[in-house]
């Protein structure tokens, strides 16, 4: 099942080539296994972390955050919003940075079926037509990314309680996780033309202690994906409340997402900003209800 997808351009400066015949990469140490010093070096944002003294509280914390994530998916309704994307690519064959700025409608729809965490996330242009991405490197799947903490999927990852850290004036709980590739169903995909590679992620969640909602979620590849030459990719999602007038519904949704990565000999940076969330009703004709 898809948790996110990254789409690489198949035109312009980034023409894909056949993957090199290389041996699979050696398994890398995950966030769950790193020492605090190793983690801080990898993720400098953790430098002010107040380290946990034990893991005794972890099962209860996972139960509480799992309940909050499950409630989000139980309460989720089809939504659309305005997405402003800034995409910047650097590479040795570019005389200057490739810079793209686009505005889209970002749509997240509930898919029929038993698994409520599977959402259909798509983009259209502001008039509802097909989204034109050009040479942008784009990622999709941010709304459902917290599914790694859903009770039905927690057994597919390893977790570790790191401690407390202040984020946006809140003394948050910080938990790291790493997917177990042998059992994980929530996988990411990297798409380059007709090549699709499956990837597994590790991540860090900053959790509000009063509500156990995830305020910030960062994910990284567990290891490089050599089939499509993706060396690294880091996604950082910041969430906030969105209240809709219809039914007085409140959802916990992405407000800002940054994606950094290295593909082939190129580095890329994307900034996604979300605004004007609306409920999206799919009927004989499509209608939008504004908050």
Predicted segments, located by residue:
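Bacterial N-terminal signal peptides
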Residues: 1-12
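Structured extracytoplasmic
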Residues: 15-202, 209-215, 220-256, 260-291
């Amino acid at each position: 099942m898809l948790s996110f997808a990254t789409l690489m351009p198949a035109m312009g400066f980034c023409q894909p080539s056949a993957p090199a015949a290389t041996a699979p990469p050696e398994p890398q140490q995950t966030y769950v296994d790193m020492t605090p010093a190793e983690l801080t070096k990898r993720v400098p944002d953790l430098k002010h972390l107040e380290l946990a003294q034990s893991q005794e509280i972890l099962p209860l914390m996972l139960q509480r955050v799992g309940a909050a994530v499950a409630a989000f998916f139980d309460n989720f309704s089809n939504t659309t919003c305005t997405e402003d994307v800034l995409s910047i690519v650097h590479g040795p064959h570019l005389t200057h940075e490739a810079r793209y700025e686009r505005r889209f409608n970002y749509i997240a729809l509930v898919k029929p079926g038993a698994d409520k965490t599977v959402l259909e996330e798509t983009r259209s242009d502001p008039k509802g037509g097909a989204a034109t991405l050009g040479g942008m490197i784009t990622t999709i799947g941010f709304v459902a990314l917290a599914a790694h903490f859903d009770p039905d999927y927690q057994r597919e990852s390893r977790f570790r309680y790191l401690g407390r850290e202040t984020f946006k004036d809140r003394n948050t709980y910080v938990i790291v996780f790493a997917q177990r590739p042998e059992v994980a169903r929530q996988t990411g995909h990297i798409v380059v033309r007709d090549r699709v590679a499956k990837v597994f992620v590790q991540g860090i969640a900053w959790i509000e202690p009063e509500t156990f909602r995830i305020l910030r979620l960062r994910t990284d590849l567990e290891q490089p994906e050599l089939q499509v030459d993706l060396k690294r990719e880091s996604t950082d999602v910041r969430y906030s409340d969105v209240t809709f007038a219809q039914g007085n519904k409140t959802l916990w949704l992405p407000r800002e997402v940054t994606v950094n990565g290295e593909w082939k000999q190129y580095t890329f940076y994307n900034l996604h900003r979300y605004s004007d969330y609306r409920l999206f009703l799919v009927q004989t004709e499509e209608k939008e209800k504004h908050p």
